[in-house]
Amino acid sequence: MGTSNQPHIVWHEASVSKEERQKRNRLKSCVVWFTGLSGSGKSTLANALDRKLFEEGIHSYVLDGDNIRHGLNAGLGFSEEDRKENIRRIGEVAKLFVDAGVVTSTAFISPFREDRDNVRGILDDGEFIEVYVRCPLETCEKRDPKGLYKKARSGDIPEFTGISSPYEEPVNPELIIDTDQLAVEEAVEKIYAYLHAQESGK
């Protein structure tokens, strides 16, 4: 149940519960929260997992950091305050997807541990699967698919995570994926197996 600081705004319960929606899916809805440096492989893994789930007939969706900034978060910049608001909004959107019975993958750098923990806090136990997409900065910088590291090194992008702004590594993530060691297919199978193990209570 949500809360509001406006006393005249009340929460309306849905006629179809989250549990009823989950029973129609083959996997319990949750947020698979991919976090890591730019270029670590978050979006690649999120979309590969989404494809795997789709092919298995499981309702799923990807919330991608770049895509969200084209719409919902178009007005936000990259200051610490705006980054926090970016993640707060995504957490709320992801929660709605979970309530709809959808396995939701999110691909955001989400550099601050507190922000990730806040998202975990608004979800039920077991619904936030933190996946640390771990990759050495040197490797991410070599990949640099968007040319962002080059711009950050030259000073064109201020407060760039890993260069001029910190990335706070997860302390106890549900999964760690080393993308400089695992192929995409191997990583997806590892995540997929984890989700099914959670479903069966193993």
UniProtKB/Swiss-Prot annotation:
The keyword ATP-binding applies. The active site is at residue 110. One of its GO terms (molecular function) is ATP binding. It holds the Pfam family APS_kinase. The keyword Transmembrane does not apply. ATP binds at residues 36-43. It comes from the Bacteria. Keywords: ATP-binding, Kinase, Nucleotide-binding, Phosphoprotein, Transferase. CDD domains: APSK (cd02027). One of its GO terms (biological process) is hydrogen sulfide biosynthetic process. Its EC number is 2.7.1.25. SUPFAM superfamilies: P-loop containing nucleoside triphosphate hydrolases. It catalyses: adenosine 5'-phosphosulfate + ATP = 3'-phosphoadenylyl sulfate + ADP + H(+). Pathway: Sulfur metabolism; hydrogen sulfide biosynthesis; sulfite from sulfate: step 2/3. Catalyzes the synthesis of activated sulfate. Belongs to the APS kinase family. PANTHER family: BIFUNCTIONAL 3'-PHOSPHOADENOSINE 5'-PHOSPHOSULFATE SYNTHASE (PTHR11055), PAPS SYNTHETASE, ISOFORM D (PTHR11055:SF1). This is Probable adenylyl-sulfate kinase. It comes from Halalkalibacterium halodurans (strain ATCC BAA-125 / DSM 18197 / FERM 7344 / JCM 9153 / C-125) (Bacillus halodurans).
